[in-house]
């Protein structure tokens, strides 16, 4: 039996360790990624664009790529169809991009085939398997165990060779506020992946789609893409920080402006809205938002929020942090909230 390999905390704290690398900067890490979307949405077009970029060291949507050999297993296509796509996408292709339209299943030799490929092309950076279902075999095992077992074989291979492997998969036709819950199969798939991508259109006939990205080392991002001339082009990219900022109610931005020339303010929620000349927000909602964003947005803007119950109603206190005079100071010293004296 193999002995457990352990590392003590002191070593982890002080020894420089190699950080995960990205084949596409801040988007596609080394390891296993799931790329999911409905049938005929254009997943293969996007995968081919990605493969072309990495094989030539060209940026993908202004994001640098790590140049190297690329293997694209187009297991639902023919070489003729791949050639037609290349005609439409590029005038110049690299000898570093390799295609195959058939392979073994995971259960009968795919990993061995990939190992042999790497012996011939040791500078490979990316392998795309399109699709997962084409390399799986029917199993009577528990669905979660089957999903986890299959995807773990691919992940172990990717980790062992420090390269990126993208597995193309489908999503279910269902409504869910979390797009990642639409990935076909069990959480054994998404739970094993280092990153998960979901490409989704609001309407099937639309030429625009959203690409949702999440992962262990990949920050949550949303991309708006447009399919034009057989190529997915970037319209807009939003980071997790930008998306979080968009969730902040507009009235709180106006509250920051309201407090810009004040050191403190106190009163009821109704009085606050009247002072700000706000007519579209009700008192209970502004109170909820003040509490929800007090440690994030308000704190970032150096505003201290306090709430108390008085004989004549609920009172709100707003104050600038000590040392913040509106000139962008960054003091962390708080000041006591304004005391409201009941008549």
Regions found by a protein language model. Give the residues of each.
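Conserved RecA-like P-loop NTPase ATPase core
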Residues: 28, 51, 72, 130, ...
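Hydrophobic positions on the alpha1 helix immediately C-terminal to the Walker A/P-loop
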Residues: 46, 50
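Gly/Ala-rich phosphate-binding loop of Rossmann-like dinucleotide-binding domains
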Residues: 55
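DNA transaction DNA-binding modules
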Residues: 225-343
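Phosphate-binding/switch region of NTP-binding enzymes
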Residues: 34-36, 40, 44-45, 73, ...
